[in-house]
A protein has these predicted regions:
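Short active-site neighborhood of thiol/selenol oxidoreductases, capturing the structured segment around
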Residues: 78-101, 107, 121
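Thiol/disulfide oxidoreductase modules built on the thioredoxin-like
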Residues: 136-143, 150-203
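N-terminal targeting signals for export/organelle localization
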Residues: 1-67, 205
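Active-site-proximal beta-strand/loop segments in catalytic clefts of secreted hydrolases
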Residues: 92-94, 124-127, 150-151, 186-187
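A short beta-strand-turn-helix
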Residues: 62, 67-88
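Structural microenvironment flanking redox-active thiols in thiol-disulfide oxidoreductases
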Residues: 101-141, 153-158
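Short, conserved catalytic or interaction motifs in soluble domains
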Residues: 32-35, 102, 177
């Protein structure tokens, strides 16, 4: 095969990769601000969805969360992996999202109740082109836990297909003490539902 004939193939592969990434980002946008969702993402059979819409994975079958690091809304460096040894609650949100606004006080209340018990909350703010909007949201709802600033949604694309990946905004994931994904919700959460997600993971030895 000549160099001339190889060039279009490389170009086609690059174009296919770009289209795949764009489609993944678009899928997240289309499901944004939904009040519910479905389990799945690649045919994973290791998790079970309960009647409350919360999906869980047994301890021996969990997948590690991807690298989730970067700058927070306040400009500080944060790496979720640094919280290994604690139960981590990840919440994907946007200031423009009505269900996110509804659940924000519930997240803050449970965070205040559990932060002394080795539970760390981390937000991932997405689709906010202006960081000032995200900061205003936190101020309005009294959110005190840190949030990574991810305006393009690139952190969400790091989750492997077939795991308990976030598929809507809001989404909430619970990571066990080893940094593995133990539970997921694709809807806004009440205090009770959030505790239902966290308590079994917190009780694990």
């Amino acid at each position: 095969m000549s160099a001339t004939s190889r060039t279009p193939l490389r170009s086609n592969r690059s174009r296919a990769t770009l289209l795949a990434a764009t489609a993944a980002a678009a899928a997240l946008t289309l499901s944004a601000c939904s009040s519910g969702g479905t389990s799945g993402g690649g045919g994973d059979t290791n998790f079970v969805m309960g009647k409350d819409g919360i999906s869980t994975v047994t301890k021996g079958e969990r997948t590690a969360a991807p690298d989730l690091s970067g700058k927070t809304i306040d400009g500080n460096a944060l790496d979720v992996a640094s919280f290994k040894g604690k139960v981590v609650v990840l919440n994907l949100w946007g200031s423009w999202c009505a269900p996110c606004r509804a659940e924000a006080p519930n997240l803050e209340k449970v965070y205040q109740d559990l932060k002394a018990k080795d539970v760390q909350f981390v937000g991932i703010n997405t689709r906010d082109a202006q960081v000032a909007n995200a900061r205003a949201f936190e101020k309005q709802y009294g959110v005190s836990f840190p949030s990574l600033y991810d305006p393009t949604g690139k952190l969400m694309l790091r989750f492997k297909k077939g795991t308990l990946n976030p598929q809507a905004i809001p989404s909430t994931l619970v990571l066990d003490r080893q940094g593995k994904i133990a539970a997921r919700s694709l809807a806004a959460l009440s205090e009770d539902k959030l505790r239902t997600m966290i308590d079994p993971v917190l009780a694990e030895k």
